[in-house]
Amino acid sequence: MNNGFFNSDFDSIFRRMMQDMQGSNQVGNKKYYINGKEVSPEELAQLTQQGGNHSAEQSAQAFQQAAQRQQGQQGGNGNYLEQIGRNLTQEARDGLLDPVIGRDKEIQETAEVLSRRTKNNPILVGEAGVGKTAIVEGLAQAIVEGNVPAAIKDKEIISVDISSLEAGTQYRGAFEENIQKLIEGVKSSQNAVLFFDEIHQIIGSGATGSDSGSKGLSDILKPALSRGEISIIGATTQDEYRNNILKDAALTRRFNEVLVNEPSAKDTVEILKGIREKFEEHHQVKLPDDVLKACVDLSIQYIPQRLLPDKAIDVLDITAAHLSAQSPAVDKVETEKRISELENDKRKAVSAEEYKKADDIQNEIKSLQDKLENSNGEHTAVATVHDISDTIQRLTGIPVSQMDDNDIERLKNISNRLRSKIIGQDQAVEMVSRAIRRNRAGFDDGNRPIGSFLFVGPTGVGKTELAKQLAIDLFGNKDALIRLDMSEYSDTTAVSKMIGTTAGYVGYDDNSNTLTEKVRRNPYSVILFDEIEKANPQILTLLLQVMDDGNLTDGQGNVINFKNTIIICTSNAGFGNGNDAEEKDIMHEMKKFFRPEFLNRFNGIVEFLHLDKDALQDIVNLLLDDVQVTLDKKGITMDVSQDAKDWLIEEGYDEELGARPLRRIVEQQVRDKITDYYLDHTDVKHVDIDVEDNELVVKGK
C-alpha cells in the first residue's frame, strides 16, 4: 500500500527514535529534577544521603537551601557589584587610571555633594567630550590619596554598565530582581557609590510599558535614593539632561547638578602634559611640548564641531599611532626566537666544519642582538608640529600643513593664479586674495568668516566663476563650493531652507539639505549666494549674524560655526561702467535693494567691470583649453589659428551680456563641428581649426 505515513523511510526514522529513547534510559543519560531544577546524579545521591528518612518535600527544601548557600558563596551581593561594573577606586590604587589635570573645582564640588547626609547624588552635566567621566576617575584618585571629606574617605566608586543589568532578563521580574540585587549589594557593602555614565538611559530602562505594570530602573531607584540607602553619581549631556531627567521632577530633585564646562586652551595643554607619559609609553613616540600646543591650537581651529579636551587628545593619539605604525617596534619574542634558531644553525655549521657559513651566521646574530639592545624601552620616533598638521589634514581633508617656503610662495601667488582664470577683474581678485592670505598666515581676528564680499556687476563677467576658482584653489575641488540660487529663497518660508524648520513643523527631524547642515559637515567651504537681491528679507537678516558673529543657530538649537567659510554674494543691482567717479552712484543704487546695515557687514563691495575685446582674447584661450581637455580623452590634439580666435571673439562679443555669448559660440562652432568631423573620421588624431569664407572649418589628420 502506498501511504505517505507508513513507508520504509518513516519506519527507519521511527526505529531511530526508539533507539534514542532506549539509550536515554541508561543510567548515564538520566535527568533528575527537584522542584523544577535539574540536578546531577551526584547531587541527588548527596541529597539522599543527607536527607536520611526525611520526606521528599523536606529533602527538596534542604537541597534548595544548599543551592542558595552555594550561590551566595559564589556570587553574593558583593560579588554582584563586581560582575556588573568596574571598581574605579581599586583601579586608582593599582595605577590604571590616567591622571586628571585642571578639574579640581569640579572634583571638589562632586565630593561635597557625596558627603551630604541626604540627596547625596551628584550629576555631572556637560557637552560630549569635556571630561565628565575623567572627573569621576579623578574623584576615585582623590579618595585613594585621602584628599576628600572624611564622610567619603572609604567610599568605593563602582562604574555600572546599564546594559549589563538588562542582559539575560528574558522573563518577567528578572530585571527587577537584578536591580534589587544591586541595591542589596550597595547596602551590604555600606561604602559603595554607583556611577552611571549616560545616566539618562535609566529613564524607562527595563520598563515594558504602562499596561504591563513593569517598572523601569529610575522608578525602582527613586525610593532608595530618597531614603539615602544608595548614592549615585550620574553623567549626561545638557540636551539629554533637559529632555529626560528634568521631565521627571521626582527624579530631578534627588540629584544635585554639577556643571562641567569646556576647559580653556591653556588648561587643555596642561591636561595633555599630564597624560603625555602614558601616550609615550604606549606608542613609543616622543611628544614634545610644542606638539601638545599644536594639538590644542589646530583642533580648535579646524575641528570646531567638537569640544576640548577630547578632540585634542584624539589628535595626539592619532598622530602618535600613525608615527608608531611607520616605525614599528622590534618584536622581542620573535627576535629572540630567531637568535635561538641561528645559534643552532651556527653549531651545525661548526660541526660540519663550514666556518665561513658559521662566521656569517655569527654576524647576523650580533646584528639582531644590537637591535634588541637599542630598542629596549627607548622612543623610536619624535612627533613634530608638521605631523599634527598632517593628522588634521587627514581628519578634515583641509590642507593645513605647516607653512613652508612652498606654501608661502603659493599664498603670495594666489592672486596671479586667480587672474589667469578670471579675466579683467583684477580689483575683485586682489581683494579676495588679501583676505585669504591674512587668514592662512594667521593674522585675522578669528571671530568672523574668512571673508565676506558683495560682487556687483553685469551678467557674464565672472562673479560666479571667481567663487568656483576660489574653492578649487583653496580646497582642491569644486565640491567645496556651496551655491545657493536666491531665486529659490524668495518666499516667506525660505528661512526653513537655511536653518531648518522649528519644532512642531513637518521636517523638524530632517535638516539634511539645509545650509547649516552643509556647513556643519564641511566647515571649510565657499558659500555663494547667487543673485542676492532676489532673496527674502528674512534671509538677509540671518546673514547679518553670520557675517558679524561667524555663527548661526539652526532650527534644532545647534550653533553652527561659519568662521572657516568665505561668503560671497552676487548681484546685478546698481552696476556701472567701472569708473571711480561712479562708485557713489553704485552705492546709491544698491541702497534701493539692501539695507545699510547689510551692506556695512561686508569686508568689501567689489564692482565687476564690463569685458572688452582684449579680455575676451584671454577668455577664448581658456574656453579652447577646456575643449582640448575633452579631446585628450579621445587622444586628439587641436590647433586653432589666430584668425579663428579673432572670428570667435567677433561673433561672441556682447558688452552687455559678457562672456556667456562667447561660450555659446565656442560650443556651437568648435565643439559641434569637431564632433561632426569625428563621427565621419573616427581615426582622426589631430584637428586644425581655421577660417575660410567667413566660416569656421575643421580639418583633420
UniProtKB/Swiss-Prot annotation:
InterPro entries: AAA+_ATPase, ATPase_AAA_core, Clp_ATPase_C, ClpA/B, ClpA/ClpB_AAA_lid, ClpA_ClpB, P-loop_NTPase. ATP binds at residues 126-133, 457-464. Keywords: ATP-binding, Chaperone, Nucleotide-binding. Residues 81-332 are annotated as: I. GO terms for molecular function: ATP binding; ATP hydrolysis activity. The keyword Repeat does not apply. GO terms for biological process: cellular response to heat. Residues 58-72 have a biased composition (Low complexity). The keyword Nucleotide-binding applies. Residues 47-79 are annotated as: Disordered. Residues 336-371 form the UVR domain. Residues 383-575 are annotated as: II. GO terms for cellular component: cytoplasm. Transmembrane segments: none annotated. Residues 47-57 have a biased composition (Polar residues). Pfam families: AAA, AAA_2, AAA_lid_9, ClpB_D2-small. It comes from the Bacteria. Belongs to the ClpA/ClpB family. ClpL subfamily. Required for the development of induced thermotolerance. This is ATP-dependent Clp protease ATP-binding subunit ClpL. It comes from Staphylococcus aureus (strain MSSA476).
